């Protein structure tokens, strides 16, 4: 709206409606018969989803068949975040270093894996979603790993990724037409705002962000540029974050995130001189 766009909001949850209503008109998508009709009748030009879970909603096909552009990757290109094992295979294909990782179906399977490979593992959800029963649990010893595996929720299984240390950073870039355009480098405070004060078992507490269009730390060069053939093949369009651990003198990719939502979209848009017209051209 700061760039002159007329903004409205589609509500997908039963809470947090006040902030959206202060910006413009709101529409409850749960009671909307046809999202396509709503978009077309309001002459909406662009839809910016706030979560990758939009693609799993009952109105997703309505959105894609509407007259509006969607600022998000679509279809198979979303697997780079959605399916952690897919991301591992993609890195192997394009020679991007990736920690040893395994998918376990249940507790017994997970314990069998760490019996065969007695290392510290980071425990993650294999299918990434804000609603997943498991979020990142960093284990720094084999004992920590075993203890956590006794009490996590195995409804979707678990993704076990070898722990490579604390030297972690992320890099956000725009991908358009198979090309990678660097934006920022960021570092999350996963343990506490002022240093390492315990094991992580949940979302980060905050972070630092540095404008980095020249990729001064080499994160994009190591983890995003090698994937350009795949980005072009799938038509991946939108913001992506590659997060890596610096280990044995190189960056190892630990995950990729499609950067949609309140934590990243406002920052990205404010970095653009003309955000509304730029997004319409992508």
Q: PLM ranges: what are they?
A:
Residues 1-74, 108:
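ATP-binding N-terminal substructure of ATP-dependent carboxylate-amine bond-forming enzymes
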Residues 18-21, 37-38, 79-85, 132-133, ...:
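Short, charged, surface-exposed secondary-structure boundary motifs
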Residues 43-45, 118, 155:
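Short, high-confidence coil segments that cap the C-terminus of an alpha-helix
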Residues 52-54, 126-128, 259:
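Short glycine-rich anion-binding loops that position phosphate/pyrophosphate groups of nucleotides
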Residues 65-136:
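A conserved helix-loop-beta module that forms one wall/lid of the active-site cleft
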Residues 134-261:
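Internal nucleotide-binding/catalytic subdomain
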Residues 259-277:
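ATP-dependent carboxylate-activation loops
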Residues 280-282:
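Peripheral (often C-terminal) accessory segments that flank ATP-dependent C-N-forming ligase machineries
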């Amino acid at each position: 709206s700061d760039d002159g766009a007329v903004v409205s909001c589609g509500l997908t949850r039963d809470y947090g409606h006040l902030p959206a209503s202060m910006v413009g008109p709101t529409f409850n998508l749960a009671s909307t018969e046809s999202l396509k009709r709503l978009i077309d009748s309001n002459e909406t030009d662009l839809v910016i989803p706030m979560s990758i879970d939009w693609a799993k909603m009952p109105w997703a096909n309505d959105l894609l068949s509407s007259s509006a552009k969607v600022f998000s990757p679509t279809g198979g290109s979303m697997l780079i975040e959605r399916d952690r094992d897919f991301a591992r295979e993609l890195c192997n294909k394009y020679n991007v270093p990736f920690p040893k990782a395994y998918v376990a179906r249940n507790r017994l399977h997970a314990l069998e894996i760490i019996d065969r490979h007695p290392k510290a593992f980071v425990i993650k959800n294999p299918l990434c979603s804000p609603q997943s029963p498991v979020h990142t649990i960093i284990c720094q010893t084999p004992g920590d790993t075993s203890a956590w595996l006794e009490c996590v929720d195995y409804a979707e299984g678990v993704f076990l990724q070898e722990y490579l240390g604390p030297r972690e950073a992320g890099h956000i870039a725009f991908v358009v037409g198979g090309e990678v355009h660097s934006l920022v480098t960021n570092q999350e405070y996963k343990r506490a705002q002022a240093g390492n004060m315990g094991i992580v078992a949940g979302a980060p507490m905050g972070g630092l962000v540095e404008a980095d269009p020249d990729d001064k730390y080499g994160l994009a060069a190591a983890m995003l540029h090698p994937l350009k053939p795949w980005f072009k093949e799938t038509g991946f369009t939108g913001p992506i974050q590659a997060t890596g651990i610096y280990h044995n003198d190189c960056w190892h990719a630990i995950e990729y995130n499609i950067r949609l939502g309140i934590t990243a979209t406002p920052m990205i848009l404010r970095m653009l001189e003309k955000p509304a017209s730029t997004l319409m051209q992508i």
